């Protein structure tokens, strides 16, 4: 039987928030950098390239692995947006000019530390003059240039497989994606497996 309360104040005095499972809340930020390179032509055009800012984790779990900058919401953060700004700057020394929410990931079992709800953001910054460096629990921060190419079979025919390569110095991160369809003019991809 549900107990009835005459006022909200009475209800809140007896309310026990500990009786509900509480996940941790985090943010993850995909920071894209746009870099302009002058092209040698009479027009002095600029060739633009795009990179993704990644951090090498300095602590467990996944110590030594490359990841998006991010971290846990604390009591000092006013919002997940403020948390995202704080985490990007503390881990990379890069100040995002704007943050756009792109999704929330809440499935249990995604993180070995427990049930974590992650709020994902994207930010685009000019890479010119930005010195990314690791800080806080990030051992290192680097810009990785992206390349998305179709995978050809032995006969030179393009399959529905695509390779995403992210490169910084002597480090290359790769993944294979399969094109699974086109709906309403938009291609859909499925992450196949890590590529070597």
Which residues does each predicted region cover?
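N-terminal leader/linker segments that precede catalytic domains of diphosphate-processing enzymes
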Residues: 1-196
